[in-house]
């Protein structure tokens, strides 16, 4: 396997992010054009569709981190109440050579964490209250180092944009299914041709089947190797693979799913937020294998 430098990995993540944006814009235009045609909105509809796509891409690039944090109910971690967490984040950021990210906490008993943002200067790390309660200092440091690796490697923009894209794909599926179920545009359908109702029905059914598959394909770009790389890089940052290994062992033993778990954002977390439940869109490598690899590292 050809070894790549950190800068090459960062450049690859940026390229993939832009590729996702372009491909998704084409998909969105195709779906939107069907609505424009079906409701006979003409050139006005096409103009509004183009504006929507541009606006959505801007939101995905500039505001996706805020959307991700809001979607899980994350709040800024008070520096006095969570002074140990802030101290660890600052230490690890210094060791990783990146600016200290903003620190967030989500009220969730499952031990977990994720990083988000468009670049290291605009990054955030979020941990659950369950993680803070369950981990000792070395274990928490290992988890933070893992997330800091995603920030340093510029994984965060790609992961966050994919989450927003996946969320909209699921939303589009639901819109079609509701349109099919409630017969939105019924008068227009009867005025045009009854066959259009059949077309809408087929599109809704097809989307309901392929939307999760599209999500899976998109998220497959968030390779499992990225998690292995972040594990190893994090261990080297803090010069200790055993803290993260111990943390992953505790995380793996917690079997209850996250209350706010979503298939759109699952890949962002350090561990599968659905717990031990096997589901179609799993993006994380087995925790047992991650622990094994960490313990085999020589630092």
Curated annotation (Swiss-Prot):
Mind telling me which Gene3D superfamilies this protein's record contains?
Answer: Metalloproteases ('zincins'), catalytic domain (3.30.2010.10)
Entry binding sites for Zn(2+): 146, 150, 227
Decide whether keyword Lipid biosynthesis is in the record. no
Q: What organism is recorded for this protein?
A: Caldanaerobacter subterraneus subsp. tengcongensis (strain DSM 15242 / JCM 11007 / NBRC 100824 / MB4) (Thermoanaerobacter tengcongensis)
User: GO CC annotation: what is one?
Assistant: plasma membrane
Its annotated compartments are:
Cell membrane
**InterPro entries given in the database record:** HtpX_protease (IPR050083), Pept_M48_protease_HtpX (IPR022919), Peptidase_M48 (IPR001915)
The active site of this protein is located at 147
Where does the source fall among the domains of life? Answer: Bacteria
Give TM regions: 19-39, 41-61, 156-176, 198-218
Q: Would you tell me the protein name for this molecule?
A: Protease HtpX homolog
Q: Topology relative to the membrane, per the entry?
A: Multi-pass membrane protein
Identify the main location: membrane
